Amino acid sequence: SGSCEVKTCWWAQPDFRAIGDYLKDKYDSASEMVVEKHRESRGWVETLRAKYALFKPPTERDLVYYENSPNFCEPNPETGSFGTRDRMCNVTSHGIDGCDLLCCGRGHNTRTEKRKEKCHCIL
């Protein structure tokens, strides 16, 4: 009588929240770059260089950018953004739906509604 052993190995995807937190950290610490053009024997070559020399240069695993994000507060047909003016916001939220962020420093109006409705209750 013989015995067999089966060994199975697989890669598991990390927790979605962990991935989001990791990407947010990378985004928050992204390095701004500038494009430099210089001539070499094979023609013009473009390279990226850190915009601010006082910061350490980014590694291969760091996130870099060379264009600023568009302003999503104001309407912009080029980017397809409708802006945030007249949008509903959540006064108690500190997230992306919060008035502080969504209103882009323009302030906000608070509206209180009082409704009287029949509840069709049977007692």
From Swiss-Prot:
One of its GO terms (biological process) is canonical Wnt signaling pathway. This is Protein Wnt-3a. Glycans are attached at N90. One of its GO terms (molecular function) is frizzled binding. Keywords: Developmental protein, Disulfide bond, Extracellular matrix, Glycoprotein, Lipoprotein, Secreted, Wnt signaling pathway. It comes from Pituophis melanoleucus (Pine snake). InterPro entries: Wnt, Wnt_C. It holds the Pfam family wnt. Belongs to the Wnt family. The gene is WNT-3A.
